[in-house]
Amino acid sequence: MVCEKCEKKLGRVITPDTWKDGARNTTESGGRKINENKMLTSKKAGFDPYGKSGFSTCRICKSSVHQSGSHYCQGCAYKKGICAMCGKKVLDTKNYKQTSV
């Protein structure tokens, strides 16, 4: 669950919008080279799944969060009715029987 304010912070789709002129995410000038090995040409190390990549732990259950910039996991955010990114109350769960199965 994410509030309206935090929806703007969510990531964008990686695919290029080639059908739109002046799209932000196109690689027309100096994009990725063809047949380029990114592991050899990149300046920093390759993908490190266990390294610090912006993912933190949930403030309630201490499990890993699967969305960068979030403070709560989706299960806890659903149970409490709060935004996963900022913790703002999104849903009144007073009369609900919330379960995360």
UniProtKB/Swiss-Prot annotation:
- Keyword tRNA-binding assigned: no
Keywords for this entry? Answer: Cytoplasm, mRNA processing, mRNA splicing, Spliceosome
- A GO CC term? cytoplasm
Q: Where in the cell is it found?
A: Cytoplasm
Q: Set out the biological process GO terms recorded for this chain's protein.
A: cytoplasmic microtubule organization; mRNA processing; RNA splicing
Gene Ontology molecular function: microtubule binding; PDZ domain binding
Judging by the UniProt lineage, the source's domain of life is Eukaryota
Entry keyword annotation includes Cytoplasm: yes
Q: Which PANTHER family match?
A: CYSTEINE-RICH PDZ-BINDING PROTEIN
Q: Its family? A: Belongs to the CRIPT family.
Q: What does this protein do?
A: As a component of the minor spliceosome, involved in the splicing of U12-type introns in pre-mRNAs.
| Subunit description | Component of the minor spliceosome, which splices U12-type introns.
The protein in question is named Cysteine-rich PDZ-binding protein
Give the gene symbol. cript
